[in-house]
């Protein structure tokens, strides 16, 4: 009897094989499925081969065939790497708490993220898997880690693969922990200064070992006095205008991590000269060589 038809089914499609007269074998070129086989049963695509002769007899070979079953399983591997997206902290962030929360997503839209391949390194320390919380999400995992870090700069490295062995592009995040406020020393004006000059120089020096440069703000009775230039050594000086009476001057310095220091000065501005309202001499006239009293009546605001 002659072979009437040879077909093979794969992923819902049926393909007709034709006989190669040179080899005597039945052949067909098939385009592999566009999706990985990892999420299929047994991580394989199942193929079913059917051979029919002229009499209508059919031989079927599938995954359960005792001799050829393994040949009916097709392993398809995708070639698109998973994607790592850092969430926090952001690149270049300044944090004012030594307890640092690290969070990132890893996703893959085909074979799926290999959970065990997700690794996190903080500076030179490889974080153990049991310290990383990995919560399944649509297409991957949201990963979280909380740890205590010393003040200073830090680097996070994140790596992952999918189930087909594709390696994600490593993500690196650098950030700074700074829990110490900047220093602030005010050289002028002196606390309690009383002056008849409207212009007053506010000067001092500031420094932050971790999060320089800092910003300095000056207010008088709550009114902002504008930009304060700071030198390379942290020194600053700004001429401000006082108002008549009591002036509460607040100088505040803040670093990039949001830590701040503040100094207050109270300065009184009085430009009104005292008034002489009366002069009395008793006795007048006075005998030569005798004592007399001078009394002056003055006022000042």
PLM region descriptions:
Residues 92-98, 191-198, 284-290:
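Short, solvent-exposed loop/linker segments at the N-terminal edge
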Residues 65-82, 172-185, 265-274:
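Flexible, low-complexity linkers/stalks enriched in Thr/Pro that connect modular domains
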Residues 1-3, 108-115, 207-216, 299-301:
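Extracellular acidic loop/turn motifs
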Residues 22-34, 135-144, 231-237:
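Aromatic sugar-binding surface patches on proteins
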């Amino acid at each position: 009897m002659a072979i009437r038809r040879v077909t093979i089914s794969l992923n819902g499609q049926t393909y007709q094989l034709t006989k190669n007269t040179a080899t005597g074998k039945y052949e067909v070129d098939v385009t592999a499925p566009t999706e990985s086989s990892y999420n299929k049963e047994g991580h394989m695509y199942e193929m079913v081969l059917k051979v029919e002769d002229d009499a209508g007899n059919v031989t079927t070979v599938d995954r359960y065939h005792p001799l050829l079953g393994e040949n009916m399983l097709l392993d398809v591997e995708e070639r698109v790497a998973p994607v790592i997206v850092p969430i926090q902290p952001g690149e270049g962030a300044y944090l004012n708490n030594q307890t640092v929360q690290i969070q990132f997503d890893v996703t893959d839209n085909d074979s799926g993220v290999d959970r065990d391949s997700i690794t996190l390194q903080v500076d030179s320390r490889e974080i153990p898997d049991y310290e990383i919380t990995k919560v399944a999400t649509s297409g991957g995992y949201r990963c979280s880690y909380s740890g205590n870090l010393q003040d200073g700069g830090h680097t996070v490295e994140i790596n992952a693969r999918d189930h087909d062995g594709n390696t994600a592009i490593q993500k690196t995040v650098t950030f700074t922990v700074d829990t110490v406020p900047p220093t602030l020393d005010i050289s002028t004006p002196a606390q309690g200064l009383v002056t008849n000059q409207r212009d007053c120089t506010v000067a001092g020096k500031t420094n932050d070992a971790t999060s320089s440069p800092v910003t300095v703000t000056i207010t008088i009775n709550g009114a902002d006095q504008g930009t304060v230039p700071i030198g390379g050594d942290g020194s600053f000086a700004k001429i401000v205008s006082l108002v008549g009476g009591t002036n509460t001057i607040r100088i505040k310095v803040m670093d990039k991590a949001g830590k701040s220091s503040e100094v207050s000065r109270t300065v009184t501005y009085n430009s009104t000269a005292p008034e002489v309202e009366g002069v009395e001499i008793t006795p007048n006239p006075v005998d030569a060589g005798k004592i007399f009293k001078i009394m002056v009546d003055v006022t000042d605001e």
